[in-house]
Amino acid sequence: MKTQKQQYVTIKGTKNGLTLQLNDDCSFDDLLSGLRELLLLEQYTDGREGHKVNVHIKLGFRYLTEDQEMRLTEAVSENEHLVIHSIESDVMSTEEAKRLKAEAEITSVAKIVRSGQVLYVEGDLLLIGDVNPGGTIRAGGNIFVLGALKGVAHAGCNGNKQAVIAASRMIPTQLRIAQVFNRAPDQKEDGNEMECAYLDIDGNMIIERLQQLAHIRPNLTRLEGGM
């Protein structure tokens, strides 16, 4: 019976270059050998002299060490017409898993953030206390202040546009969500109504009564039972 040769690499041409889908079941050495063999069969040029074709590599559920990634890059670079544009894996590294776990956690802090001080947490911040003018609080997730927010608050500082800022007294010098910022108005009534800030679908920062938060972010329930 004739044995069917295992396919180590599937190549697909796109308008952005070549996509290489790598087999994630075989050994790395077999994969590398199969890749080299396949790339030798064709020149894979776009017809323009001196122009290189972008290669997007999809690893599937395979994790590469730094050495393996370097060897893979060298194998593709042996074809002078190809250049690696991206390498994607469905496997999460330990460092990335730790980062995502930290961003999903709520950190509770009881203190006053005074002028010149910066308080940063990777996930959600629950601050029990005030933020004085000149003080700054930053969080990778949401910010909840049980007190007066009179300084700077930056939620979603790693780019999370779904983050919100809420405070018992919202009289900040500046609010930031992801890369969007909103300076405080020249005059603001010092009321006692709790408020929240969020980005709407157009990326504009909106400040509403805190009661609207349940409608704006209905999935925001991580604080339930945590206070």
Curated annotation (Swiss-Prot):
Pfam families per record: MinC_C (PF03775), MinC_N_1 (PF22642)
S-S bonds: none
Domain of life: Bacteria
SUPFAM superfamilies with a match to the protein in the record: Cell-division inhibitor MinC, C-terminal domain (SSF63848)
Record-stated family: Belongs to the MinC family.
HAMAP family for the chain: MinC
Name of the featured protein: Probable septum site-determining protein MinC
Organism: Bacillus pumilus (strain SAFR-032)
